[in-house]
Amino acid sequence: AFYFSTSCGRTADAGVWGTDPQKYPYLQPVEVKPGRQSLDLGDNDDFDSFIRSRDVTAYDSSYAMFRWETDISSDMVSAQINGAGTVTDMTVTGRGAGGIASELSVSGSDGTVTVKGQGAIRSALGNPALVIKKQDGKTMEGSATLPSAFISIEKRTGEDGKPSFHIYGGGFGHGVGMSQNGAQGMAKEGKD
């Protein structure tokens, strides 16, 4: 069985680990709410609207990590991603089932680097110095990885005039299988 802490309102499939999802037909990307519909969130515009919305409901939408945000400077990204040089831009260029980021393009003074896989993306953008602001207003620090790869990235200009990146995120974990907080939310509603 596969499980994770908190969803973003959607789940992913086994493709997040580079595995053929057809080998695991029971791991389907679905909504974490009644009806469990499968929505296509593979387009950045559709996913950006979804992850930035505070109106999405799910069995675990009341949990703090259902939605979160953080800021990462170009200096921090430059130090963590080899080969790009001084980072000037970052874009999600591939999305897997449920909208999870599967490919990230990082452009800089020395060229463009592609980061592939949700785990690699979470590690490349995570840093213990990051302050993750949870939807309940509380913060979390000290994690070497992003909480999840269900992310949308908005380029901004930092106080130093350099590019910075605001990350809108949702959920905590890889997003495959059962959301533990989703299951708890179902139990609170009297569902089996």
List the model feature ranges, each with a label.
Residues A1-D192:
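Conserved, single-site charged/polar hotspot
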